[in-house]
């Protein structure tokens, strides 16, 4: 398809302005990670050459995504309550899946530059997968740490997804993806270490406690505390960078924070005041709703950033959450069946997320005159 006909189709999510702007997009990034630059980069440069030049970069991204999906569902099968005894191999398997994902995530961009196939779609596909992967890896990581299905594990997962959103918001505002000194690579190795610790020392290791004068805390809760506080520090750095180097107004950035902040607030309220103890009755449907919604809103921000467009503060898919709040707050759960609603809403959210991914990918491949999972023969363009 010729790019002159890029507006000869309809898209729910990609505006005509976005179609024009993505043709101008250029990635700008900064990685200050010692491990990435001085250690892993040598391995990744070697590994990417194992792929044939006919191999599409997005296919590498997809392989990494699939490895995390498999890890999540295998863990869910053996540890549906995110704790308890599981086969020892599972912990090594989860660590291996993160390593595979890390390698694929590092090599997809290298492959794109190697075969001259870099595009805004590639970055969107990469970071869009990362948004969903954040939910999945945090769930499996906390399962190895024996945290269990509860408000603590749920909040920690969504908090890290919020941190990921803030990193994207910083790039949206400044135009630069700053991975920092402690970035994704270090986080991934930390999670691998958690899985490996459980393999060697067993599940009970995480229930040991450490005392700080009169304060006592379990090892697994200490890890989560470090994770949460690290997220706070990261968000503060993001905010400082936005205020200092941002090209967008403060009001625009606040508006961009509205949907994700509402999601975080509603998730905490619903989980705490559910009339049916949702963490016991439909935990993975409930948590999955917010995992997917966080990934969806983040994906829309990434799309807006790459296409130099705007993120709407009103997300229609979130409107049913008003009914949940009313059902709990005003009607004490008697307005409708909360469990049934949770399950139905989960599938609605999932379908909307899949539709978003399909619509955006198919639209941008037409605009950019490329394929998503194969490389177009340049003689055909």
Swiss-Prot record:
Family: Belongs to the CDP-alcohol phosphatidyltransferase class-I family.
InterPro entries on file: CDP-OH_P_trans, CDP-OH_PTrfase_TM_dom, CDP_ALCOHOL_P_TRANSF_CS, CHOPT
Transmembrane segments: 59-79, 84-104, 147-167, 190-210, 222-242, 250-270, 284-304, 311-331, 344-364
Name assigned to this protein: Uncharacterized CDP-alcohol phosphatidyltransferase class-I family protein 1
Major localization class: membrane
Cellular localization per UniProt: Membrane
Pfam families assigned to the protein according to its UniProt record, in alphabetical order: CDP-OH_P_transf
Gene Ontology annotations for the cellular component aspect, listed alphabetically: membrane
GO BP annotation list: phospholipid biosynthetic process
Membrane protein topology class: Multi-pass membrane protein
KW Iron-sulfur (keyword) present: no
Keywords from the UniProt entry: Membrane, Transferase, Transmembrane, Transmembrane helix
Gene3D superfamilies: 1.20.120.1760
Superkingdom of origin organism: Eukaryota
Keyword Cell wall biogenesis/degradation: no
One term of GO molecular function: phosphotransferase activity, for other substituted phosphate groups
């Amino acid at each position: 398809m010729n790019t002159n006909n890029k507006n000869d189709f309809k898209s729910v999510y990609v505006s005509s302005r976005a179609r024009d702007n993505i043709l101008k997009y250029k990635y700008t990034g900064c990685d200050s990670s010692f491990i990435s630059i001085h250690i892993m980069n040598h391995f990744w440069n070697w590994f990417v050459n194992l792929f044939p030049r006919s191999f599409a970069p997005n296919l590498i991204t997809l392989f990494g995504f699939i490895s995390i999906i498999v890890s999540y569902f295998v863990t869910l099968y053996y540890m549906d309550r995110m704790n308890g005894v599981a086969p020892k191999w599972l912990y090594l398997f989860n660590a291996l899946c993160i390593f595979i994902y890390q390698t694929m995530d590092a090599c997809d961009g290298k492959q794109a530059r190697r075969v001259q196939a870099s595009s805004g779609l590639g970055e969107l596909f990469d970071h869009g997968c990362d948004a969903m992967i954040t939910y999945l890896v945090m769930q499996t990581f906390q399962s190895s740490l024996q945290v269990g299905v509860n408000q603590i594990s749920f909040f920690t997962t969504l908090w890290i997804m919020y941190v990921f959103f803030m990193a994207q918001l910083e790039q949206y505002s400044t135009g630069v993806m700053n991975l920092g000194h402690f970035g994704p690579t270090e986080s991934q190795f930390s999670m691998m270490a958690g899985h490996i610790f459980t393999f060697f020392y067993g599940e009970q290791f995480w229930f040991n406690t450490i005392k700080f004068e009169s304060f006592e805390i379990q090892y697994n809760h200490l890890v989560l505390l470090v994770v949460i506080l690290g997220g706070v520090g990261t968000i503060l750095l993001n905010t400082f960078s936005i205020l200092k180097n941002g090209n967008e107004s403060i009001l625009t950035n606040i508006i961009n924070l509205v949907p994700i902040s509402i999601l975080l607030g509603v998730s905490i309220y619903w989980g705490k005041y559910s009339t049916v103890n949702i963490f016991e009755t439909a935990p993975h449907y409930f948590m999955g709703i917010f995992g997917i919604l966080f990934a969806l809103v983040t994906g829309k921000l990434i799309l807006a950033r790459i296409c130099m467009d705007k993120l709407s503060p009103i997300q229609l898919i979130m409107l049913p959450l008003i009914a949940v709040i009313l059902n709990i707050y005003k009607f004490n759960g008697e307005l409708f069946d909360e469990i049934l609603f949770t399950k139905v809403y989960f599938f609605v959210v999932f379908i909307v997320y899949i539709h978003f991914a399909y619509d955006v990918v198919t639209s941008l491949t037409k605009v950019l005159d490329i394929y998503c999972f194969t490389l177009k023969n340049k003689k055909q363009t």
